[in-house]
């Protein structure tokens, strides 16, 4: 009976809720904008010259850069089915499309600000538990027009940009790092990309949560 009710609600969601309930889902490939500094989360096959020596993660102003796409996945050692809405408080991984490495953090110092280093780690989408980030947002689900924070699940820092700028060979790109303190520097928003639609049943659950 409960399943039938959800399926019936699915039709209502399609008619009423589709325009204002654009949830972000597993399997989506997106660019993430830091709303304070207007840069998109970016990576490339350039390694840090200090700290971990892993692949660097930066912020770029370019809207068109192909190195700014990230796939949203379930946390380490789990599978999040494509089209599953991301809940506020849910741990996820963000996998860099062009290099196959995951957004990662650990107790190394970032090169410019002295905060916690954020890197890209792993091979072909598989790294370790330090790739997990918890989505912090208002309401039951991460929605496309809403701002979110990403809290590193193991060290509790927030994915942040505070404006420090690199020189060569990545001139003009901003440092991305982890900070313990919540501030306007920690807010991100899903922008361009390919957003996987929820299944009918999952869309029904989203609508039911909003009633």
From Swiss-Prot:
It is found in: Secreted. GO terms for molecular function: misfolded protein binding. One of its GO terms (biological process) is chaperone cofactor-dependent protein refolding. This is Stromal cell-derived factor 2. InterPro entries: MIR_dom_sf, MIR_motif. It comes from Mus musculus (Mouse). GO terms for cellular component: endoplasmic reticulum; extracellular region; protein folding chaperone complex. The lineage of its organism: Eukaryota, Metazoa, Chordata, Craniata, Vertebrata. Pfam families: MIR. Residues 1-18 form the signal peptide. It comes from the Eukaryota. CDD domains: beta-trefoil_MIR_SDF2_meta. Keywords: Repeat, Secreted, Signal. PROSITE patterns: MIR.
């Amino acid at each position: 009976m409960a399943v039938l009710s959800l399926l019936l609600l699915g039709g209502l969601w399609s008619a009423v809720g589709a325009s204002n309930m654009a949830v972000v889902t597993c399997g989506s490939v997106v660019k993430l904008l830091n709303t304070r500094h207007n840069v998109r989360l970016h990576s490339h096959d350039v390694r840090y010259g200090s700290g971990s020596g892993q692949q660097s993660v930066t912020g770029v102003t370019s809207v068109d850069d192909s190195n700014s796409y990230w796939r949203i996945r379930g946390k380490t050692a789990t599978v999040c089915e494509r089209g599953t809405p991301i809940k506020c408080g849910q741990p996820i991984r963000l996998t860099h499309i062009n290099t196959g490495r995951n957004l990662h953090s650990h107790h190394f110092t970032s090169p410019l600000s002295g905060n916690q280093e954020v890197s890209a780690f792993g091979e072909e989408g598989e790294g370790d538990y330090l790739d997990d980030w918890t989505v912090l947002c208002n309401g039951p689900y991460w929605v496309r027009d809403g701002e979110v924070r990403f809290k590193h699940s193991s060290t509790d820092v927030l994915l942040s940009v505070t404006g420090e700028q690199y020189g060569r060979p990545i001139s003009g790109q901003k440092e991305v790092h982890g900070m313990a303190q919540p501030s306007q520097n920690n807010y991100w928003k899903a922008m361009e990309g390919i957003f996987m639609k929820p299944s009918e049943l999952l869309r029904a659950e989203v609508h039911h949560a909003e009633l």
